[in-house]
């Protein structure tokens, strides 16, 4: 894949398992810092699109929270396999959009894989604690359970 000669396209939003064209009027150019070539345009999602994504995530959570830990782990292992399978392509794209060497981009991918591998061990991380006889005839226990939807937001350093 030659990112430097690939024409850019507008990125779409993934909402409720479907790729959606954004209705926004604000777009962010992803620029190769070495060539100043626009690689892609990424939408600043509209409030309605953000709300639709949140609502979809909340609906999905109702199933996810009932999914056995082993099944969740298999999903994360599949993600790990897909990242490994496509790591060269991902590194090429990272290199072009961030102006870093392929080796540095591959290091980023490796660090990301470490996070995924950590998530694969969630079964042992979700074990609660049990304390016997904390008071006369009273035992206590804690449970670790998924609590809901969260979002990761990052500041764009190149937004006007």
What feature does the model see in each segment?
Residues 1-34:
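Hydrophobic face of amphipathic alpha-helices that form TPR/SEL1-like repeat modules
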Residues 129-160:
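Conserved small-residue-rich beta-alpha loop and adjacent elements
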